[in-house]
Amino acid sequence: MTEEMQYEYLVPLEKYLSAGVRLGTRLSNKYLEDRGFIFAVRPDGLRIFDIKKIDERLKIAAKFIARYRPERVLVHTTRPYGFKPVQMFCKFVGCKALTGRFIPGTLTNPNLPHYQEVDLLFVVDPKLDAQAVAEAAKMGIPVIALVDTDTPHQYIDFMIPCNNKGRKSLALIFWILARQVLRERGELKPDQDLPVPPEEFETKLVQS
């Protein structure tokens, strides 16, 4: 039996594939390539992430997040498809959700009414959430981020390579992380799932 067959994924491999979690962009990213995160390049130029690497990073990220008091963890996204996944993750884990525009000074100016004092920042896309990442770096706050092949890696302390743009991908990623954080805390048994499926974390399309 090969090592790949023995490896136990957090969810069945088919779930990762159907959610498009491994799909990157057509942009090259030497930083991610050098670290073995990119598995292949399709004929059309689309980068494909190594699902096992994604799974491994999710396990580590869950352990990392579980070490912090949830009320001191801020999860931020300006990407609309990330709003529902972030809100659901924070609902189950107890973290603070900040969706939409990040007001300058949120992490750096205690005189502002919207100031947030946090110990860990988690962002969906460092490119779109650059203001939050920059303020966290200035304040010495560690940053976890979902990174695609078009994502800058500066100031990111721990990256989870994945498709950080798709509705289904973001829903599955945050569902897995919520479940794993609760398992790490002992609030769920090692084989216990969340009471809702990943689809409940998914942003619904509005019919016109």
UniProtKB/Swiss-Prot annotation:
GO terms for biological process: ribosomal small subunit assembly; translation. Residues 189-208 are annotated as: Disordered. It comes from the Archaea. The keyword Ribosomal protein applies. GO terms for cellular component: cytosolic small ribosomal subunit. SUPFAM superfamilies: Ribosomal protein S2 (SSF52313). Keywords: Ribonucleoprotein, Ribosomal protein. The keyword Ribonucleoprotein applies. One of its GO terms (molecular function) is structural constituent of ribosome. It holds the Pfam family Ribosomal_S2. Belongs to the universal ribosomal protein uS2 family. This is Small ribosomal subunit protein uS2.
